[in-house]
Amino acid sequence: MSSTDLLKKVRKIEIKTRKLSRQIFAGEYHSAFKGRGMAFSEVREYQYGDDVRNMDWNVTARLNAPYVKVFEEEREMTVMLLVDVSGSGRFGSVSKTKRDLTAEVGAVLSFSASANNDKVGALFFSDKVEKFIPPKKGRSHLLMILRELIDFEPQSRKTDISEALRFLTNAIKKRCTAFLLSDLMDFNEDRKPKFEDALKIAAGRHDLSVINIYDKRERELPDIGMLRVSDAETGGEMWIDTSSRRVREEYAKWSEDVNIAVRQTLRKYKVDSADISTDSDYVKGLITLFKSR
C-alpha cells in the first residue's frame, strides 16, 4: 500500500471509529472497564446521607465537627491490544478480510480507551512477537497504532498465541485491560487450543477479553462443487468437493468442535469474549461484550 493510500485509509477509519467511540461506546466502555479502584480526594464536612464508614475521626476530633473522607475512582487504566497478524488474517469471503475487521475493531477500542483518558499500547504477533508499542496517550500515538493495524507486515505467517500472552504477562507488570484480537486458529490435533496454559496465567494477572475475528466460510462450506482451498500460514493447497453433503457436514463438525473447545477454555478462566464475523455488525458484538461484564 502506498503512503498516500495508507494515509487516506487511516483518516477514513479514524473518522468512522472515533465517531463510534464517542457516540456509542463511551458510556458502555466506561461502565465495563473500571479503573484501579478508589483514591483519596479530600476531607469535607459530614452531610446527611454520607457513609459513616468514611468518617475521618482525627479531623472530627480536632475541629469538633463531623468530617468525612471523599474518594474518587482512579479512572486511568492501561489498555493493551494483542493483535494477530498471521497469514490467516488475510482471508475474507465478503467485502473485507479478517485483518480489515481487526483494524476497525482495534481502532474503536483504542479511541474508546483514549476518550476515557487511558493509555493504549499494542502488541502485534504471529508465531512470535513481531512488534511491541508501549502504552502511551495522545492522538499521534493512536494514529501510529492505527497505521500498524492497517498495514503491518509480519515476518512470519504462522500463529502462536501463547507467545503473545507470555509477552503480555512479562512486559506489563501492573494489571491492565487487554484485548486479544485473533481468529484463534491455534489448536492441537485433538482440536483443543494450544494456548490454554498461557491464557490461564495472563487472565490471572490482567483483565483479559478475547475478540474472535472470523469469516463465515471458516465455519461452513458453500455448495459450489470443487473448491481449491489454501492454508495461508503453511502455503499448503488442496481441492474439496463441496457438493458432497458429507464433506460439508464433516467440515462444519470440525469447526464446531474447535469453537466449543475455545469457548470452554475461555469460560474456565473467566475470560469475557465476543465472536465477530467479517459480514456482521461489529458494533453489536462489542456492545454485547461490554454489557456482559
PLM feature segments, named:
Residues 141-176, 189, 215-216:
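Von Willebrand factor
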Residues 133-147, 291-292:
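Short, electropositive alpha-helical surface patch
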Residues 66-68, 164-167, 195-197:
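A generic local structural motif
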Residues 103, 157-161, 191-192, 255:
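A conditional alpha-helix N-cap/helix-loop micro-motif detector
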Residues 1-33, 42, 51, 170-174, ...:
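Von Willebrand factor type A / integrin I
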Residues 89, 93, 149-153, 270-273:
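Short amphipathic alpha-helical interaction patches enriched in hydrophobic/aromatic residues
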Residues 105, 163-167, 258:
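Well-ordered alpha-helical segments embedded in enzymatic catalytic cores
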Residues 1-137, 177, 181-182, 189, ...:
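An amphipathic, basic-hydrophobic helix/alpha-beta surface used to engage anionic
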